[in-house]
Amino acid sequence: MHLNVVNLGRCEYEKALQVQIELLEKRQRGEIEDTLILVEHPPVITKGRHADETNIIGSEASLINHGIQLFNTDRGGDVTYHGPGQIVGYPIVNIRKSKIGVKKFVENLEEVLIRLLDEKYHITATRSSVNPGVWVGANKIAAIGLAVKRGVSMHGFALNVSTNLAHFKFLVPCGIADRGVTSIEEILGYPVDFHVANQHVLAYFSEVFNYDIIETVE
């Protein structure tokens, strides 16, 4: 199977969202192949369709003072933080055509990150039957939140590599109050090459979803 890859580098959330929408519509029309967008965002808190406002701690003004934007989205889930040092992946994938279903698709996204963490960083991570995402003990290392429109996915996953975990004090991540957050660097205790980690994400995404033709596009 064929996978297009779009590397946006450091990109504002709103701009990346517009890219997602454009590619989503093209995939729905069958004009492009399945596509994985990889991006790193400036600090932003996004609210999902079912977000509880009380899970944002502090006013919008206080967030702005700390350089954190606030953005409403149509993905599933509650509130999530994105920021530098976090690999964000937006799979624009025709789930209907693949016939795996949304539940299995989410499990595969979790599998991508669980395998990567185990085989490249010797970190044992797990999934939860209750809360989507990837966990190391009681701490979330990767968040997952999707939207599916006319059979095609958008939004996706966020893996904490060297993320500023102090910014998570401004929210209750994914609305789960009794769990914490962590990152690859926090667990290992030494710096991790972000570019290399980004390449690992692409490699394991391709492996788990059985893409054998990988093409980088603008």
Curated annotation (Swiss-Prot):
Substrate binds at R75, G76, G77, D78, V79, T80, Y81, H82, A143, I144, G145, G156, F157, A158. GO terms for cellular component: cytoplasm. Gene3D superfamilies: Bira Bifunctional Protein, Domain 2. It catalyses: octanoyl-[ACP] + L-lysyl-[protein] = N(6)-octanoyl-L-lysyl-[protein] + holo-[ACP] + H(+). Its EC number is 2.3.1.181. CDD domains: LipB. GO terms for molecular function: lipoyl(octanoyl) transferase activity. The active site is at C174 (acyl-thioester intermediate). GO terms for biological process: protein modification process. It is an enzyme of class 2 (transferase). The record marks K140 as: Lowers pKa of active site Cys. Belongs to the LipB family. This is Octanoyltransferase. The lineage of its organism: Bacteria, Bacillati, Bacillota, Clostridia, Peptostreptococcales.
